[in-house]
Amino acid sequence: MNPEVRAAKVGDDEALLRAHQQVWKRKHILRYYYETWYKLIDEALLPGTIVEIASGIGNFSSRADRRKIIATDILCGQNVAVVTDAHYLPFSPGSISNFVMIDALHHMAKPMQVLARAAECLKPGGRFVMLESYMSPWASLVFKFHHEKSDYSYDIYNPLNHMPQIWYGNAAMSRLVFDRPERLPLIVESIKYLEFLSYPLCGGFTYRSLLPAPLLRSLHKLEVSPLFANRFLGLRMLAIMTKL
């Protein structure tokens, strides 16, 4: 485990966020992966207002080469502009051009409510760009060694019996939400599947890298091939949704 994360007090969410910020500053290979994903998100965004939902430590919104982003989160943070619950976004109907959400859907108690509220706030033709873990057949094996478990019994409409657990994440959430796109309040334009093996080997925010950074980068370049980047082997998904 990364020493910064080990030192964070269990149950202290603000301490864990600070630990993640320290890991981000120190761990070059972690920034490499996220910058790769940020570029894909950038390419999908439309001109106009950009709001990030559940921004965490705010790495996406703090990039200097980006248009201004309104970062929101349920906790205060260095780059957080609006402190709010994602289920009750405080924006006027039809006022936002883009919503972005990165690695947060699996923490949402009522993900359909979050999407419905975002749809209300989007302008016609506006986009919701989401990067999220994806429980492919391969991922179901990888996540057996991950601290966030998958629960396919979770009721995305009435989760009250699961409320204490959802804060720690449900890796199956993207499947529960996107496997039936006809239920979504937005139109799914595209889903791109990402990653295979190199990112887990880098350890993410929580664990130490298992391989040297140059080797991880080389492996990652191979993983962009459709041989690995597909719904059977992908570990992540980039979903682009639009409001009609």
Where are these regions (language model features)?
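Short catalytic micro-motifs in class I SAM-dependent methyltransferases
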Residues: 103-104
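A conserved beta-strand element that flanks and buttresses the S-adenosyl-L-methionine
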Residues: 100
